[in-house]
Amino acid sequence: MSLEEKRALQNQILAEYANLASNLETLVKVLQDMVYNPSNNILDSLRDLEKEVGLVYTLYKASVWAILADLENNQEGKSGMFQDES
């Protein structure tokens, strides 16, 4: 390989590195924009998710309350049965 061929190859490699550096800078800018300025689609999705989680939490609390109320009623019913027998 002659000296001129080596220099041409070296210039091609340097050009590719410059292109890669430029692409990485563009990627960094896009990622920073995504981090600091979230898109409306992401925010809307998170709002919908927040509503669904709130609904599930409310239903869960209601279910636990219903179970505890049933247990309390069952215990009162059993204690009432024993009081009637005496």
Curated annotation (Swiss-Prot):
Domain of life: Eukaryota
Cell cycle keyword on record: yes
A GO CC term assigned to this protein in UniProt: mitotic spindle
One Pfam entry name: DASH_Dad3
Main location: nucleus
A biological process from GO: attachment of spindle microtubules to kinetochore
Annotated localization: Nucleus; Cytoplasm, Cytoskeleton, Spindle; Chromosome, Centromere, Kinetochore; Cytoplasm, Cytoskeleton
Keyword Transmembrane helix: no
Keywords recorded for this protein, A-Z: Cell cycle, Cell division, Centromere, Chromosome, Chromosome partition, Cytoplasm, Cytoskeleton, Kinetochore, Microtubule, Mitosis, Nucleus
Subunit annotation: Component of the DASH complex consisting of ask1, dad1, dad2, dad3, dad4, dam1, duo1, dad5, spc19 and spc34, with a stoichiometry of one copy of each subunit per complex. Multiple DASH complexes oligomerize to form a ring that encircles spindle microtubules and organizes the rod-like NDC80 complexes of the outer kinetochore. DASH complex oligomerization strengthens microtubule attachments. On cytoplasmic microtubules, DASH complexes appear to form patches instead of rings.
Functional note: Component of the DASH complex that connects microtubules with kinetochores and couples microtubule depolymerisation to chromosome movement; it is involved in retrieving kinetochores to the spindle poles before their re-orientation on the spindle in early mitosis and allows microtubule depolymerization to pull chromosomes apart and resist detachment during anaphase.
Family the UniProt entry places it in: Belongs to the DASH complex DAD3 family.
Protein name stated in the entry: DASH complex subunit dad3
Organism encoding this protein: Schizosaccharomyces pombe (strain 972 / ATCC 24843)
Gene: dad3
